[in-house]
Structure formats: C-alpha cells, structure tokens
C-alpha cells in the first residue's frame, strides 16, 4: 500500500502531547479560503512555479520506521505521532494502516482532522487514535459551505459520534478575522464544547498568512489578509474562555503570559472555570 505525503515535521510540540513527529498527508476535500497549506489540496504530486516538487509516495511501514527513530524523545515527554493533512481521512486506508502500525509499535497517536469524512471512515481509524485534534472551522451552516466548500452537518455528526464513544478530543478553533470570530460563532463554540463531555479543551489558532505565497506559486487563490495584531489571539481566547466551562488554550511562543493564564509547551492556557486547569493542560499538551 502506498499513499502521498507533502511534509514531515520532527520535534513538534504544538500538535498533541509531548514531543511529536507530525506527518502530513496530501489531499483535502475542503477549500478553506484562509488555508495555510494550499499545497495539501490536490492528491497529486505537484510542482511549484520554481520547479520544486510538492509531495511524494511512500508506505505506512516506511513512515512508522521513520517516526520510530525519535522514540526516546516520545518516551521521555509523553509524545508520539500526529497525522495531519490536508485531510488525513481522505486517504482512509493509508491513514488507518499508519495508525494501526504506530499503535502496534507502542506509539501514542493523535489525528488532526476537519471531521469531514464518511462515518465508516471515522470508525475505521477510531481504535488507533489516542487523541483527536478536531478542527471546528465554522458553526454557521451557510458560512461553512461558503468558506470551506463543504457542509457542516457531517462534521458535527462525526464529532458527536466520537464524543459518545468517549474518545479524547481537543476542539481546535482556527480564528479568521471577519469570518468566524464574531460573538455568535464564539458562543456556538463554547456551547458545543460544553455539550460534549469528551471535549477536554479548546485550542485557539489565530490566522497566519502562511498560505498566500504558496498559493501564488501553485496558481491558486486564498484569502489574502494581513496577520492580525499580537493582541488578537489573547483577546479571542479570553472571550472564548468566558463562554465555556472547558479550558481554552492559545497557540503561542510562551514568551508572553496572559493575566489569567500560564505558558505551557508553547501555549497560553486560560481558566475556563474548571479549577486548576493549568496543571491539567500541562499534562494534556
């Protein structure tokens, strides 16, 4: 069996617990206009305008072999393998086999997903996933279809199915100025997190314009907006923390500490009303 990747990052600390290797599978059914990885959209191996190749074919066995090279770091930090994309569930059998072999090898596994996949695909990988990093992009059905190109319904159905199965879930919240950061969206996110017992935390990911240059080099169009000011992320996270009982994390560099939070593994953590969440989140991330 072979599948297509477009990147591997080693030593990652923001994509699940501990030190991790992040493996990015190529191909995605969504077309989020703010996407920071437009090179992940196509399932095919491509070339940038400068001739640089994007993507390569490999096997699950070779991926797990490469990931295992850093196992001492995972063991020391509680880390492991994170699969991302694109949308990893779009290469369903390939994704499932990587995760199966990783678990067989004793690796902790995380899966970052948009949740846009058939239920049977989600169920096929569920036994091999230790924690789900579940991107909730928009909670207004009309806006979701407009800005991602796909309907919201299956995303929520799969999320609720995973929560009912008591899967560990971190709700990731990419926040895009003027698109999904209004009061109604934030309230909906907080309410959804409180509704689902298996959601352990919310992870705020402020917009960054990483995808613009890559899109231009591939002849694609994405949302072109400047990076929001440094205070944008903390303000969104602080607002969201007041709308949910769950902990809220803000992806950051750990250099500035918000008044109500502490830096933990590159994240600023906000108390969502659950007591000493700083200690809980240091264990989670």
Model-derived segments and spans:
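Fold-independent oxyanion-binding glycine-rich loops
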Residues: 8, 25, 38, 60, ...
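N-terminal [4Fe-4S]-dependent radical SAM core
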Residues: 1-59, 69-77, 268-273, 280-285
């Amino acid at each position: 069996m072979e599948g297509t990747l477009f990147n591997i990052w080693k030593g990652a600390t923001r994509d699940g617990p501990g030190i991790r290797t992040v493996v990015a599978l190529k191909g995605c059914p969504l077309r989020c206009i703010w996407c920071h990885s437009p090179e992940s959209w196509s399932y095919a191996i491509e070339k940038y305008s400068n001739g640089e190749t994007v993507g390569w074919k490999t096997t699950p066995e070779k991926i797990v072999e490469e990931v295992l090279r850093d196992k001492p770091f995972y063991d020391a930090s509680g880390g492991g393998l994170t699969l991302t994309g694109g949308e990893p569930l779009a290469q369903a059998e390939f994704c499932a086999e990587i995760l199966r072999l990783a678990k067989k090898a004793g690796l902790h596994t995380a899966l970052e997903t948009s949740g846009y996949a058939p239920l049977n695909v989600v169920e096929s990988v569920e036994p091999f996933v230790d924690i789900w990093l579940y991107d909730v992009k928009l909670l207004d059905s009309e806006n979701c279809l407009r800005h991602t190109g796909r309907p919201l319904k299956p995303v929520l159905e799969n999320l609720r199915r995973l929560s009912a199965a008591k899967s560990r879930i971190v709700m990731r919240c990419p926040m895009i100025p003027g698109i999904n950061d209004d009061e109604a969206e934030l309230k909906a996110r907080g309410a959804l997190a409180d509704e689902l017992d298996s959601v352990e935390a919310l992870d705020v990911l402020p917009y960054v314009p990483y995808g613009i240059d890559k899109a231009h080099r591939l002849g694609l169009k994405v949302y072109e907006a400047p990076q929001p000011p440094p205070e944008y992320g903390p303000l969104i996270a602080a607002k969201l923390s007041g709308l949910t009982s769950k902990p809220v994390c803000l992806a950051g560099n750990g250099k500035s500490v918000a008044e109500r939070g502490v830096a933990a593994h590159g994240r600023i953590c906000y108390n969502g009303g659950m007591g000493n969440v700083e200690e809980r989140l240091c264990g989670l991330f």
